[in-house]
A protein has these predicted regions:
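Conserved phosphate-handling catalytic cores of large alpha/beta enzymes
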Residues: 144-205
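Phosphate-handling DNA/RNA-contact segment within nucleic-acid enzymes
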Residues: 5-155, 159, 172-173
Length: 205
């Protein structure tokens, strides 16, 4: 959880001995457009740590949320114009084209099942794991890449696309399956009729 503050994490990390430049280069602070200094990138968001294949945290995703009336005064409802999700930008250790969310915890089951379920978002992935589909990973805000498919091809033969059922999700499904064909995957699509995305389907069932 990232509170609605411009400098909560910044001040905490400075107290730990990090410089403002180091915090900015890590992608968790943004340089001010006017004047010196930086401010927290993630504010009033549910946070999702992004790990590499060994489980080391290399970035974050943050989902905006609205705060119910009566919540603590230091947290305020978010601006509807803000992006629903924001992610750590490209850094020295975080390259979104070569990372799959939850790959570190799913890879053993992907190998054991010889298949992977591919979803779009963090919540889709979390809810799938909670429902027992532990061979699920998420692309998390980026188009599926050859590097990501190479990672998966080492572990399994089948890829099951379960993207959102809106127009953007259907387009992403077509692109992902076309790209997966170049890596000789057996390809499947999981059609979801009960909700807009996999997280909705898990909640309703």
């Amino acid at each position: 959880f990232a509170p609605q503050s411009w400098d909560f994490l910044l001040n905490a990390l400075i107290k730990k001995g990090f410089t403002k430049e180091e915090i900015e280069h890590a992608g968790i602070a943004i340089k001010k457009q006017e004047g010196p200094g930086v401010y927290d990138r993630f504010r009033s968001r549910i946070m999702f740590p992004i790990a590499d294949s060994s489980g080391r945290i290399i970035g974050f995703g943050g989902r905006i949320f609205s705060v119910p009336s009566g919540a603590a005064s230091q947290v305020v409802p978010t601006d509807k114009t803000e992006a629903k999700y924001i992610n750590t930008p490209q850094t020295m250790i975080y390259d979104k084209s070569s990372v799959l969310y939850a790959f570190d915890v799913a890879k053993q089951d992907i190998r054991a099942q010889n298949k992977v379920v591919l979803v779009e978002g963090y919540m889709d992935c979390v809810m799938s794991h909670q429902a027992g589909v532990t061979y699920t990973v998420a692309v998390s805000g980026t188009a599926l890449t050859p590097r990501q498919l190479q990672m998966l091809r080492r572990l399994c033969d089948m890829i099951i696309s379960s993207f959102d059922t809106d127009a953007a999700g259907e387009s992403a499904t077509r692109r992902s399956l076309a790209l997966a064909s170049e890596f000789d995957f057996e390809r499947r699509v999981a059609h979801i009729h009960t909700g807009k995305d996999p997280a909705d389907a898990v909640l309703e069932n």
